[in-house]
Regions:
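HhH-family (HhH-GPD) DNA N-glycosylase catalytic core used in base-excision repair
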Residues: 1-180
């Protein structure tokens, strides 16, 4: 994949479900599909049961980021920012997961956000087995909205729990359209 640095993309703070093992293989899920992603000799490899089209869209691979950044001219500082961000792709994440992760991220650090999101998925997401490991899909808004009050306490997300529940209820009842 051109212009894709998986470490920069997964570690820049835009997503919280990808974790690298000791060999640099990232394991995670997107749209309920588990995957393993790694770089070897400058090439990115992906192992998943999901259709290639889904991953192309998820990693936004059909967008020419080099062409976009070539259009910016702002001096030395902007050039250094563009160079630093080279290889980062804007992930086309599932809207509900992105919203929920955003709520969790308020006044939080990446390590804690990852922990809360992981507990959310393990507690309320559907298990999916892949390559001998169990992954958890991100729970749907409908699943979260149907929970009893206090059920999110297990996440240890503090004051964010009612906001997660409120957002889930709005998505589930259609008053918040994430595709609008």
């Amino acid at each position: 994949a051109r212009e894709l640095d998986i470490e920069k993309t997964f570690e820049c703070g835009q997503c919280f479900r990808w974790n690298a093992d000791e060999n640099g293989v990232y394991r995670g899920t997107a749209f309920g599909y588990p995957a393993q992603v790694w770089t070897e000799d400058g090439e990115v490899y992906l192992c998943s049961d999901a259709p290639e089209k889904m991953w192309r869209e998820y990693f936004d691979l059909d967008r020419d980021y080099a062409g976009i950044s070539a259009g910016f001219h702002g001096g030395e500082y902007l050039d250094s920012c563009i160079a630093y961000g080279q290889g980062i792709r804007i992930l086309r994440q599932e809207p509900w997961e992105a919203l929920c992760s955003f709520i969790i991220s308020q006044c939080n650090n990446i390590s804690r956000i990852k922990g809360i999101v992981e507990r959310l998925c393990e507690s309320f997401g559907e298990p999916v087995e892949f390559e001998g490991a169990v992954y958890y899909a991100f729970p749907s808004a409908q699943r979260i909205a149907a929970l009893e009050p206090g059920a999110l306490d297990v996440l240890r997300c503090g004051y964010r729990a009612p906001y997660i529940m409120s957002a889930a209820q709005a998505v589930a009842d259609g008053s918040l359209d994430l595709e609008a």
